[in-house]
């Protein structure tokens, strides 16, 4: 039985990447050391981390005036690092279109009680369980504000922000954790991009930060570990980095490039997600909660049946058939198919076949 992993993260990795990692696990490039053992100060790891940055810059078209930093703590730590480093007593706007955007805003509010800055909720769709991307008038934004924070893909709710809104000249910071390298964005549209690795980049443990040089703090922050300038000046080696996660990320970047880059990934993702959305839309048994079809995520597709009991039955039977981790997030229920870059089109085809059978037996 073929297993298809629909996990929202940690997520499926490309099979060629896993095979190469397996081959280098015991003896990395003739060093007689496992890649798990090489020192982060060694030539071997220097080649790994520089190669990872080089491939990422090429894939995303990252300009020279942006720094790439490999950090720890997940994307969630960035919810604190961003205001600590960048807010500096100014206003900071938050566009909240999903649960993770809400967490970023909530963390900012918490920090503002001890650090001088003013987090402002710019727009939110929480009142309708984030089933659409909220709009705002850029004139509402103070042009002297530190930043506007957005989330480009909402893994739980299944929406995406494809067109970056105008912000009255204020720098845009994006949490791109779940659709980085899956959808093409212009890096210059953002002052900073950050992404946890465990969806389209690699295993959990490393967070990629792409930050324009003029956004990097000159004054020290509360902690050296949380200081973008210190981390950037140390070339991501202020302390021991998550070396193996960076190694896998490099292999994933190589794999993406070998298949044609981000353009090819987006094309494949549109094909995969389109198959599933088309079937759901044609069915009276299944439904997708996203109000605006143009805002539907290519990477995370939530859906439900006609009642919660059948949702539970679907998850149980799907899991038994090899469709793993298809249960929806605990906050919304139902099901969720996460179709990241490494997820095969054949898995979508077979899921749809199962959905048809389940509908015929339970409608």
UniProtKB/Swiss-Prot annotation:
What Pfam families does UniProt report for this protein, alphabetically?
Answer: Aminotran_5
A GO BP entry is: pyridoxine biosynthetic process
Alphabetical GO CC annotations of the entry are: cytoplasm
Q: In which pathway does it act?
A: Amino-acid biosynthesis; L-serine biosynthesis; L-serine from 3-phospho-D-glycerate: step 2/3
Q: What class of enzyme is it?
A: transferase
- Primary role: Catalyzes the reversible conversion of 3-phosphohydroxypyruvate to phosphoserine and of 3-hydroxy-2-oxo-4-phosphonooxybutanoate to phosphohydroxythreonine.
**Name the UniProt record assigns to this protein:** Phosphoserine aminotransferase
Record the organism: Streptococcus agalactiae serotype III (strain NEM316)
Write the lineage as a comma-separated list: Bacteria, Bacillati, Bacillota, Bacilli, Lactobacillales
């Amino acid at each position: 039985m073929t297993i298809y992993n629909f996990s929202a993260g940690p997520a499926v990795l490309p099979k060629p990447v896993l095979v190469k990692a397996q081959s280098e696990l015991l003896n990395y490039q003739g060093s007689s050391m496992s890649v798990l053992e090489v020192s982060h100060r060694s030539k071997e790891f220097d080649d790994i981390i520089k190669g990872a940055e080089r491939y990422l810059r090429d894939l995303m078209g990252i300009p020279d005036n942006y720094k790439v930093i490999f950090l720890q703590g997940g994307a969630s730590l960035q919810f604190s690092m961003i205001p600590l480093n960048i807010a500096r007593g100014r206003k900071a706007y938050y566009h909240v279109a999903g649960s993770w955007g809400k967490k970023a805003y909530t963390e900012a509010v918490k920090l503002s009680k001890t650090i001088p800055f003013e987090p402002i909720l710019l727009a939110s769709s929480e009142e309708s369980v984030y089933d659409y991307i909220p709009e705002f008038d850029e004139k509402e934004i103070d042009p002297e504000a530190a930043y506007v924070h957005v989330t480009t893909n909402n893994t739980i709710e299944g929406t995406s922000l494809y067109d970056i809104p105008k912000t009255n000249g204020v720098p845009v910071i994006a949490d791109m954790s779940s659709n980085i390298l899956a959808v093409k964005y212009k890096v210059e549209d953002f002052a900073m991009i950050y992404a946890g690795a465990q969806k389209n980049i690699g295993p959990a443990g490393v967070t990629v930060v792409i930050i324009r040089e003029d956004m990097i703090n000159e004054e020290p922050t509360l902690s050296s570990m949380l200081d973008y300038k210190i981390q950037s000046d140390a070339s991501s080696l202020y302390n021991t980095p998550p070396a193996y996660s960076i190694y896998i990320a490099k292999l994933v970047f190589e794999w993406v490039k070998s298949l044609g880059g981000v353009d090819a990934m987006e094309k494949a993702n549109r094909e995969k997600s389109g198959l599933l959305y088309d079937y759901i839309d044609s069915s009276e048994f299944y439904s997708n909660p996203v109000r605006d079809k143009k805002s539907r995520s290519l990477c995370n597709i939530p859906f439900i049946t006609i009642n919660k009991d059948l949702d539970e039955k679907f998850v149980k039977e799907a899991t038994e058939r090899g469709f793993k981790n298809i249960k929806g997030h605990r906050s919304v229920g139902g099901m969720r198919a996460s179709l990241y870059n490494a997820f095969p089109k054949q898995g979508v085809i077979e899921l749809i076949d199962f959905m048809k059978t389940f509908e015929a037996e339970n409608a």
